[in-house]
């Protein structure tokens, strides 16, 4: 029985990519800088001491980071007995965004350039804004700028609740984000507005990767909180991913947990499981692993590393979340059967010690575990697509156009 379990620790980079300088990210190192802060007592909020990741270390995380950066992460166990295969991968795709990283993991790198809204103020074309106001019957809009999602809620949340005007904002990624209060504006109305925005962006040829619904609750600045009802409206991958090939060629199953289905625009997904928070995502993953049959991929995105800690530049929070994941990892390893493979990886970096609030261009870890997987180094991989090619070969699918099998 063949089953693959793919876990994306969203934004968990392990050192600057070769082309990091062209992204303004030379020197970025999500894992390394978190580990250094912990070792120096600079991340003792809600946790204490050096970064403690014994189970990820057994899968080769520290050694993969050493290969990536030439430095072993401070505080991690250099003498851990490694029970898995480990390496690191470069990104071939043109961007450092979520769809690019995930599509490339599934064998389809993004070799075109996304469209972006470059202006930090008055970010969106007036014609687009006017059309959205008219089609969605809006009283107007707020924002129209680059911003961190949490900052803009404190700045404009109260005005939004009073006026009924949605908050439009973007970032360095190819995104059009819309924040609205779940109760005063309405969740379904927000989703409908996002559908309209997606349609207009498509028709206008803007080539924007995602429209993201950002619902929130609360009653005043400092008390607003984004909810788990986020919804991403992505464009479809430009070629069949290994997910779609598994469904088409083997009539297999692909179980999406978290935002995976949104990222792939539901293409190649046979079941969607919604969960919010690391523990809930972990619980849902374990449940699906227990019931997975032959020719099944269980694919989980642990978004909190990125959304709650990376973008918010919360080093201690990121460290605590990694330690929580690590504590629960033995539960996952125990469910890996004789012919299964478990792959732990990331989609980009988001160094919480870095300037700004955007992603960082980094290598990703590639940690592979299974009773039939030979422990040892997988070395440097030229593309995230090596993961997709490896999974395609494992299931006996037609080869992907990009990537080399790792074993």
Swiss-Prot record:
Gene from which this protein is expressed: deoB
Keyword Oxidoreductase belongs to the record: no
Main location: cytoplasm
UniProt GO BP: 2-deoxyribose 1-phosphate catabolic process; 5-phosphoribose 1-diphosphate biosynthetic process; metabolic compound salvage; nucleotide metabolic process
Family in the record: Belongs to the phosphopentomutase family.
Pathway note: Carbohydrate degradation; 2-deoxy-D-ribose 1-phosphate degradation; D-glyceraldehyde 3-phosphate and acetaldehyde from 2-deoxy-alpha-D-ribose 1-phosphate: step 1/2
Protein name: Phosphopentomutase
Binding site for Mn(2+) 2: 306, 311, 359
Keywords from the named record: Cytoplasm, Isomerase, Manganese, Metal-binding
EC number per UniProt: 5.4.2.7
UniProt catalytic activity: 2-deoxy-alpha-D-ribose 1-phosphate = 2-deoxy-D-ribose 5-phosphate; alpha-D-ribose 1-phosphate = D-ribose 5-phosphate
């Amino acid at each position: 029985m063949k089953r693959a379990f793919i876990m994306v620790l969203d934004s968990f980079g392990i050192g600057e990519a070769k082309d990091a300088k062209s992204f303004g990210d030379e020197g970025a190192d999500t894992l390394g800088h978190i580990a250094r802060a912990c070792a120096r007592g600079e991340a003792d909020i809600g946790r204490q001491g050096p970064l403690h990741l014994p189970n990820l270390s057994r899968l080769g995380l520290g050694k993969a980071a050493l290969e990536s950066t030439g430095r072993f992460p401070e505080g991690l166990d250099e003498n851990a007995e490694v029970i898995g295969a480990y390496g690191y991968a470069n990104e071939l795709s043109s961007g450092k965004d979520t769809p690019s990283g995930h599509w490339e993991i599934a064998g389809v790198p993004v070799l075109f350039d996304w469209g972006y809204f470059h202006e930090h103020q008055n970010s969106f074309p007036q014609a687009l804004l006017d059309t959205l106001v008219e089609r969605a019957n809006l009283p107007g809009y707020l924002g129209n700028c680059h911003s961190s999602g949490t900052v803009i809620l404190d700045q404009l949340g109260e005005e939004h609740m009073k006026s009924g005007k949605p908050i439009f904002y973007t970032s360095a990624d190819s995104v059009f984000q819309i924040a609205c209060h779940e109760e005063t504006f309405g969740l379904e109305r927000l989703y409908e507005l996002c559908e309209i925005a997606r349609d207009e962006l498509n028709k206008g040829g803007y080539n924007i990767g995602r429209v993201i619904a950002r619902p929130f609750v609360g009653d005043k600045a400092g008390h607003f909180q984004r909810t788990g009802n986020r919804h991403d409206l992505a464009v479809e991958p430009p070629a069949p991913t290994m997910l779609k090939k598994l469904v088409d060629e083997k009539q297999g199953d692909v179980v999406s947990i978290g935002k995976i289905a949104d990222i792939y625009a539901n293409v190649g997904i046979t079941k969607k499981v919604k969960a919010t928070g690391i523990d809930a995502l972990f619980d849902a993953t374990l449940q699906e692993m227990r019931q997975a049959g032959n020719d099944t991929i269980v694919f989980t995105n642990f978004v909190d590393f990125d959304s709650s800690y990376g973008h918010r530049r919360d080093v201690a929070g990121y460290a605590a979340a990694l330690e929580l994941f690590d504590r629960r990892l033995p539960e996952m390893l125990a469910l890996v059967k004789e012919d299964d493979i478990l792959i732990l990886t990331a989609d980009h970096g988001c160094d919480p010690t870095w300037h700004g609030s955007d992603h960082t261009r980094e290598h990703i870890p590639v940690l592979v575990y299974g009773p039939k997987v030979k422990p040892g180094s997988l070395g440097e991989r030229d593309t995230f697509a090596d993961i997709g090619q490896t999974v395609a070969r494992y299931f006996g699918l037609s080869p992907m156009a990009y990537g080399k099998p790792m074993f």
